[in-house]
């Protein structure tokens, strides 16, 4: 999938090629499920991976919580400016995004900005089985608090396989590395939703959240990163 060049202070294209083997961020090894020794190694590796992800999540959440209202507002405005530049530069008119939770980059500015910039804006709704369905945003009255307290579309008729027909998909992240590997909240909603997605996928983070992240084979690799610089 093609990606835009790095532009200005806020867009970042994940690096191509293989990761540096010297990186101390854990990777999930492949072990045979038929070998008891390998089973033990696999279990230990999975536990180490879970702990590594938990540490990164805790660190990023603490940093977000520590931001003053003034700094948060400035960073959110810069994030939305980066999103605006990307959408305009690429000529995107049909996109999917999300309503950020408290303290997530972009804040309350993200959805209104994308609604102004595009002709179609689709938002996710959480469903049982950790699945996402998608509904078209049609103003504040078209959304309500969902099962996790996040604003979701009242009507979400589309399954995630429709995302490939859009111009781009904006994705929340705790952190993302320079390869495009994303660390999410841990429930796996987006790993399922974006599997095989043909549309360009965009991580939305603060610049300090572009960092090495532990990842596993099922973790989604994103195409573009936007941040506050």
What residue spans do the PLM features occupy?
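N-terminal active-site beta-alpha-beta segment that forms phosphate/nucleotide-binding
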Residues: 2-164
């Amino acid at each position: 999938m093609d990606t835009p060049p790095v532009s200005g202070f806020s867009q970042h294209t994940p690096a191509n090629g293989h990761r540096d083997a010297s990186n101390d961020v854990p990777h999930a090894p492949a072990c045979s499920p038929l070998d008891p020794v390998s089973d033990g190694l696999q279990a230990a590796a999975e536990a180490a991976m879970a702990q590594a992800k938990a540490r990164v999540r805790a660190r990023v959440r603490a940093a977000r919580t520590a931001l003053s209202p003034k700094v948060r507002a400035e960073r959110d405005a810069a994030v939305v400016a980066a999103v605006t530049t990307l959408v305009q530069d690429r000529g995107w008119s049909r996109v999917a995004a999300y309503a950020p939770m408290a303290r997530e980059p972009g804040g309350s500015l993200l959805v209104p900005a994308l609604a102004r910039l595009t002709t179609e804006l689709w938002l996710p709704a959480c469903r049982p089985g950790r699945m996402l369905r998608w509904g078209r945003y049609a103003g504040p009255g078209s959304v309500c608090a969902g099962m996790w307290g996040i604003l979701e579309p009242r009507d979400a008729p589309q399954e995630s396989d429709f995302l490939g027909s859009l111009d781009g998909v904006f994705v929340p992240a705790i952190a993302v590395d320079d390869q495009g590997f994303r660390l999410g909240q841990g429930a796996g909603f987006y790993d399922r939703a974006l599997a095989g997605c043909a549309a360009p996928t965009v991580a939305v983070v603060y610049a300090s959240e572009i960092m090495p992240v532990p990842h596993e084979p099922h973790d989604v690799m994103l195409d573009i990163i936007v941040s506050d610089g």
